[in-house]
Amino acid sequence: MKLLLASNNAKKLKELQRILDQAGLDSVELLALRDVEAYDEPIEDGRTFADNAQIKARAGVAHTGIATIADDSGIAVEELNGMPGVLSARWSGAHGNDTANNELLLAQMEHVPDERRNAAFVSVCVLALPDGQEFVQEGRWEGQLLRGPKGENGFGYDPLFIPAEEIGGQGRSSAELSAEEKDALSHRGQALRGLVEKIAQVAAAS
């Protein structure tokens, strides 16, 4: 069975591949957008993570005829009423500029005390099948914002985020966790694992 991840993000691709491997789904051939005939990527103009994930998954399956997984994810900061939210990747105005996004968020939270720095990573993953069926899973990873970046692993806002599991413990940011540790805890790991059973069913029937 072929499965398209509607992304060219190498780290997301590796993350999904690890989760499929852990589930024993060796029969699933994972593809990225670069592996299929190019198509115009849709405008992500949804108001929620689920909206945007559906837009990407539907576009992928419509253009390729291949079962497609798409995710939309970001960080929701309590003090900012849930923002950056769906704007996380382009919070500073430049899409995918992690450094600029992190710097802006830190500046906006500069004078906020530790007890009001609650945040959560949120991910919604959608599996869209060629027959029109869709399956949606959400993951949420609670924690707090740090006052400066820590760690070299991960991407996005990982260096600014201390998971709830690390508060009062080692105090590592999500960018200091190993890939395996992050998979077990993260918002995207939760959402992707929620789709594994359905992927296995589709693979068995194909």
Swiss-Prot record:
Residues in the active site? D72 (proton acceptor)
Q: So where does Mg(2+) get bound?
A: D72
What this protein needs as a cofactor is: Mg(2+)
* Cofactor, how bound (note): Binds 1 Mg(2+) ion per subunit.
Record field: catalytic activity: XTP + H2O = XMP + diphosphate + H(+); dITP + H2O = dIMP + diphosphate + H(+); ITP + H2O = IMP + diphosphate + H(+)
This enzyme's EC code(s): 3.6.1.66
Could you confirm whether the keyword Nucleotide-binding appears in this record? yes
In this chain, substrate is annotated as bound at: S7, N8, N9, A10, K11, K12, S73, F155, G156, Y157, D158, K182, H187, R188
Q: Which keywords does the record carry?
A: Hydrolase, Magnesium, Metal-binding, Nucleotide metabolism, Nucleotide-binding
What the entry lists under InterPro entries is as follows: dITP/XTP_pyrophosphatase, ITPase-like_fam, RdgB/HAM1
Return one Gene Ontology term, BP aspect: nucleotide metabolic process
Q: Name one GO cellular component term.
A: cytosol
Single annotated GO MF: ITP diphosphatase activity
Q: Does the keyword Nucleotide-binding apply?
A: yes
- Major enzyme class: hydrolase
User: Pfam families in the record, alphabetically?
Assistant: Ham1p_like
For this chain, the family text in UniProt reads: Belongs to the HAM1 NTPase family.
Q: What biological function has been recorded for the protein in this entry?
A: Pyrophosphatase that catalyzes the hydrolysis of nucleoside triphosphates to their monophosphate derivatives, with a high preference for the non-canonical purine nucleotides XTP (xanthosine triphosphate), dITP (deoxyinosine triphosphate) and ITP. Seems to function as a house-cleaning enzyme that removes non-canonical purine nucleotides from the nucleotide pool, thus preventing their incorporation into DNA/RNA and avoiding chromosomal lesions.
On assembly, the entry states: Homodimer.
Its protein name is dITP/XTP pyrophosphatase
Say which species the protein is native to: Corynebacterium glutamicum (strain R)
